[in-house]
C-alpha cells in the first residue's frame, strides 16, 4: 500500500476502504508517513468529504491507536458527557455530581483549556488540594465507591488524533465536519463509557458558529457512537452569550457551587437540568425526560447533589471547607465594576470576545505552556434582553494587573451592546438528537 495512491483516490472523490484507513493511521502514528503527505490527504478530504463508513473507520482507527480504557470493573451503565466548549462552560462541575447522586456512575476524563475556552481540569484544580492525576485502579475504585471521578486525559488516549489535530491546526483543515466528529468521538470511544451525552454548542462563542453546522456535527457523532455500540444523545445548545454569569476558573467554581445549592443563574440551571435528565435516560435510571427532570430537581433541593460534590472533592484531595464557604477562595486584587452609560436593554454579548477578556486578564492559555491565573475573570450582572438603567452595573472585572484590567474593560465595552428596543431572549436548548 502507498500513501500516494490513497491521496490520489481521495482527490478523485473515491471512498477509502477500512484496510486503507487503518494502514494509514497506523503508519502515520508510527512516523512512517510524512506530514506533507498526510496534509495532502487532509486537504483532499476537505474538498471531497468522507462518507459514513469512512468517518466511522477513521474514528475507530484513531481510538485504537492508543489505550482503549476498559471500565467493565465499574458497576452499572457508565455515562460520559462531552461539550464542544464555550465561554463560562462550567457544566461538568455541577452536572456530574447531580447524576452521580442519582446512582449513575460518572467515570470522566477531561481536558485543560486552550484559547478562549476554559477546561474542566483547570477549574477543578483551582479548588485547593484537588488532584486530577489518578492511576486507573484508583479511578475505577473511586467510581465504584462514590459513583464519580474526573481525571486528566492520559497521553495514551487516541495519540493518532493528537498528531492529526496538530497538523490540521496548521494546514487550514480544522473545520471539516467529519474530521471534527471523528476527532471528538475517537477520544470518547477510547475513554470506555457505555453511553455518551454530547452538548454541541452553537453561536458566537462556540466552535460551530452556525446552527446548521452544529446539527450536522451532532448527527455525525451520534451516528459514529451508535455504530460503535454506544447509547447516544446530542443536545444543541446556545453559546451566543457566555453561559451563566461567571467567566474565569474560581469564579466559575463558585457559580457551580451556588447552582448545586439551588441558586444558579436561569440559563445555566436550564442547561444542567436538561443534560442531567438526558444522562439519567441514557443510564436507564428513568423512563422519560419528565421523570428525569423531577429527580434532578429533587437532588438539588434535598442537598444530595451538593453532598455528592463534597464527597467527590474530598476523595480527590480537595479541601471541602471551600465548598461550604466559597468566600474563602483566593480573590483577585483588583475588582472593577463596569457601569451602563445609557438606559435600554442588553442587545448582545459576544461570547467569544468575553472569553478573550478573560484571556487578557490571564484566565486562559495563549499556548499549552501558559500558566493560568485562577482568580481572574468577569461576572455579569446583566445578560441579553435584561433591562438596564444608566449607572447600573453590567459586569465586574477581576484582575491582578492594572494594565490588563484596563485592556479587558476596553475590550468588554467594544463587545457588549445596549439597545433601545427589548430583543428576544436567547433560546438555550435548540434541538435534541438521539
Residue ranges of predicted features:
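Alpha-helix C-terminal capping segments
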Residues: 47, 93-107, 187-192, 224-228, ...
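A glycine-rich helix N-cap at a beta->alpha junction
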Residues: 123-149, 219-225, 229
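Short glycine/serine/threonine-rich phosphate/pyrophosphate-binding segments
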Residues: 87-96, 100-101, 108-109, 115-118, ...
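Phosphate/diphosphate-binding glycine-rich loops and adjacent basic-rich segments that engage nucleotide
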Residues: 144-193
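Short beta-strand segments
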Residues: 109, 143, 151-154, 199-203, ...
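Active-site cofactor/substrate anionic-group-binding motifs, chiefly glycine-
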Residues: 49-110, 114
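N-terminal glycine-rich anion-binding loops that anchor highly charged ligand groups
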Residues: 1, 10-73
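Well-ordered secondary-structure scaffolds
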Residues: 5, 10, 15-18, 28, ...
Amino acid at each position: 500500500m502507498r500513501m500516494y495512491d490513497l491521496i490520489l483516490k481521495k482527490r478523485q472523490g473515491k471512498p477509502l476502504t477500512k484496510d486503507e484507513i487503518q494502514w494509514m493511521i497506523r503508519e502515520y502514528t508510527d512516523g512512517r508517513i510524512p506530514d506533507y503527505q498526510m496534509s495532502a490527504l487532509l486537504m483532499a478530504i476537505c474538498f471531497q468529504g468522507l462518507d459514513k463508513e469512512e468517518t466511522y473507520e477513521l474514528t475507530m482507527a484513531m481510538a485504537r491507536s492508543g489505550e482503549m480504557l476498559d471500565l467493565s470493573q465499574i458497576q452499572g451503565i457508565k455515562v460520559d458527557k462531552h461539550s464542544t466548549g464555550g465561554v463560562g462552560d462550567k457544566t461538568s462541575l455541577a452536572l456530574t455530581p447531580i447524576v452521580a447522586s442519582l446512582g449513575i456512575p460518572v467515570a470522566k476524563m477531561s481536558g485543560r483549556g486552550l484559547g478562549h475556552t476554559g477546561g474542566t481540569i483547570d477549574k477543578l484544580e483551582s479548588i485547593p488540594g484537588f488532584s486530577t492525576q489518578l492511576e486507573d485502579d484508583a479511578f475505577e475504585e473511586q467510581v465504584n465507591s462514590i459513583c464519580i471521578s474526573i481525571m486528566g486525559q492520559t497521553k495514551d488516549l487516541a495519540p493518532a488524533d493528537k498528531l492529526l489535530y496538530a497538523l490540521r491546526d496548521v494546514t487550514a483543515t480544522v473545520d471539516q465536519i467529519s474530521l471534527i466528529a471523528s476527532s471528538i468521538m475517537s477520544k470518547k470511544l477510547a475513554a470506555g463509557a457505555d453511553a455518551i451525552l454530547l452538548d454541541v454548542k452553537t453561536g458566537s462563542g462556540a466552535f460551530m458558529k452556525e446552527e446548521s453546522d452544529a446539527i450536522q456535527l451532532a448527527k455525525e457523532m451520534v451516528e459514529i457512537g451508535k455504530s460503535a455500540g454506544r447509547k447516544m444523545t446530542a443536545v444543541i445548545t446556545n453559546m451566543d452569550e457566555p453561559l451563566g454569569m461567571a467567566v474565569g476558573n474560581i469564579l466559575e467554581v463558585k457559580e457551580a457551587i451556588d447552582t448545586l445549592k439551588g441558586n444558579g443563574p436561569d440559563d445555566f440551571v436550564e442547561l444542567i437540568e436538561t443534560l442531567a435528565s438526558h444522562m439519567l435516560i441514557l443510564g436507564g435510571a428513568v423512563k422519560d425526560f419528565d421523570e428525569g427532570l423531577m429527580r434532578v430537581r429533587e437532588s438539588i433541593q434535598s442537598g444530595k447533589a451538593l453532598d455528592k460534590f463534597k464527597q467527590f472533592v474530598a476523595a480527590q484531595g480537595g479541601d471541602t471547607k471551600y465548598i461550604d464557604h466559597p468566600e474563602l477562595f483566593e480573590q483577585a486584587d483588583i475588582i472593577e465594576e463596569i457601569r451602563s452609560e445609557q438606559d435600554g436593554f442588553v442587545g448582545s454579548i459576544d461570547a467569544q470576545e468575553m472569553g478573550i477578556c478573560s484571556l487578557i486578564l490571564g484566565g486562559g492559555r495563549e499556548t499549552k505552556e501558559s500558566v493560568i491565573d485562577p482568580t481572574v475573570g468577569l461576572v455579569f450582572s446583566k445578560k441579553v434582553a435584561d433591562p438596564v438603567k444608566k449607572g447600573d452595573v453590567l459586569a465586574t472585572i477581576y484582575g491582578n494587573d492594572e494594565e490588563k484590567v484596563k485592556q479587558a474593560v476596553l475590550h468588554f465595552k467594544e463587545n457588549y451592546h445596549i439597545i433601545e428596543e427589548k430583543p428576544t431572549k436567547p433560546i438555550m436548548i435548540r434541538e435534541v438528537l438521539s
